[in-house]
Amino acid sequence: MILSLLSMNINYNSITSIKQILKERKIAPRKLWGQNYLINESIRQKIIESLDIKENEKIWEIGPGLGAMTDILLKKTNLLTAFEIDLKYSEILNEKFGKLKNFKLIKGDFLKKYPNENKNIDKIFSNLPYNIASKVISKLIEENFLKEMVLTVQKELADRITAKTNSKNYSSFTVLVQSHFTAIKIIDIGENNFYPAPKVKSTTLKLIPKKNNIKDFKEFNKLIRTVFSGRRKKLKNTIINFIKNKAILEENFLKEYLGKRPENISVEEFIQISNNLNAYH
């Protein structure tokens, strides 16, 4: 593998070093874009190891920032495509890695740029900005662009993604993600492992695509959003807003669930309900 250039210029484990480069480039970390730098080397290594990069695999990195993870990834992959929205960080990334044959930088918003890129890739990696994490995951699912992903997100969101049926964190987003991925927690990360320290804990997740038998994704997504909009209500009081033919309420496939709240219905059961409802449309 090709080794990264100028890696000695930034000590990614040192707040002093990071502050220095930010000062030199007149950069102020932006909370909006999740610009918090993971300064714990052992955690960075553990996260990258969980990606389990095989020879010749192509990787996308969303939001590389100063390039701490990029530096490690480039030693493991034949092609890394990095999406960076901040032009000042893009300049730093170009200086550090721009001459490497296995590095490609895309400047701009990932959600706007990725549709135009070659999607023949194997895995996606990101320390996702907390305010857009659910949006990015939802968008990739809606577009049926399902790749193995290792993502660091706000712990609260990770708890929702990995929630079990009958738990307080079980939500429409849980059902959406778990119907398309197997979600595995890799590590919880405390605030002090970042600079600047965020106000919330983080969790790294591994999302592994899995097959499902959803017949109509749009109807499935609409169903779970509708019933979870009244999560404390029983299904009979919320699904009425989704179905057109009220006679369906008498069908056996649905009757057994009408007395349950959405948090008591499993992912597979939601898929079955959606498919059966779809047969009536």
From Swiss-Prot:
Write out the residues that bind S-adenosyl-L-methionine. Answer: 36, 38, 63, 84, 109, 127
CDD domains per UniProt: AdoMet_MTases
Q: Which UniProt keywords apply?
A: Cytoplasm, Methyltransferase, RNA-binding, rRNA processing, S-adenosyl-L-methionine, Transferase
Query: Which stretches are transmembrane?
Result: none
Q: Give the domain of life.
A: Bacteria
Q: What is its main location?
A: cytoplasm
GO cellular component terms listed in the entry, alphabetical order: cytosol
E.C. number, please? Answer: 2.1.1.182
Q: What PROSITE patterns does its record include?
A: RRNA_A_DIMETH, SAM_RNA_A_N6_MT
GO terms of molecular function:
16S rRNA (adenine(1518)-N(6)/adenine(1519)-N(6))-dimethyltransferase activity; RNA binding
Cellular location(s): Cytoplasm
The chemistry this enzyme catalyses reads: adenosine(1518)/adenosine(1519) in 16S rRNA + 4 S-adenosyl-L-methionine = N(6)-dimethyladenosine(1518)/N(6)-dimethyladenosine(1519) in 16S rRNA + 4 S-adenosyl-L-homocysteine + 4 H(+)
Q: Per the similarity annotation, which family is this?
A: Belongs to the class I-like SAM-binding methyltransferase superfamily. rRNA adenine N(6)-methyltransferase family. RsmA subfamily.
* Purpose: Specifically dimethylates two adjacent adenosines (A1518 and A1519) in the loop of a conserved hairpin near the 3'-end of 16S rRNA in the 30S particle. May play a critical role in biogenesis of 30S subunits.
| Stored PANTHER family | DIMETHYLADENOSINE TRANSFERASE, DIMETHYLADENOSINE TRANSFERASE-RELATED
Protein's name in the database: Ribosomal RNA small subunit methyltransferase A
- What species was this sequence derived from? Borrelia garinii subsp. bavariensis (strain ATCC BAA-2496 / DSM 23469 / PBi) (Borreliella bavariensis)
